C-alpha cells in the first residue's frame, strides 16, 4: 500500500 502525506499520514 502507499503512504499518502495529507494532514495525517495514511498508510
UniProtKB/Swiss-Prot annotation:
Protein name: Tigerinin-2O
Primary subcellular site in the record, as a coarse category: secreted
Subcellular location per the Swiss-Prot or TrEMBL entry: Secreted
Keywords: Amphibian defense peptide, Disulfide bond, Secreted
Described purpose of this protein according to its UniProt entry: Stimulates insulin release from beta cells at a concentration of 100 nM and release of glucagon-like peptide 1 (GLP-1) from enteroendocrine cells at a concentration of 100 nM in vitro. Reduces secretion of interferon gamma from peritoneal cells in a mouse model. Has no inhibitory activity against Gram-positive bacterium B.megaterium Bm11 or Gram-negative bacterium E.coli ATCC 25922 at concentrations of up to 100uM. Has no hemolytic activity against mouse erythrocytes.
Any one Gene Ontology BP term: defense response
Superkingdom field: Eukaryota
GO cellular component, as recorded: extracellular region
Organism: Hoplobatrachus occipitalis
Tissue specificity of this protein: Expressed by the skin glands.
Disulphide bridges, residue numbers: 3-11
Amino acid at each position: 500500500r502507499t503512504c499518502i502525506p495529507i494532514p495525517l499520514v495514511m498508510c
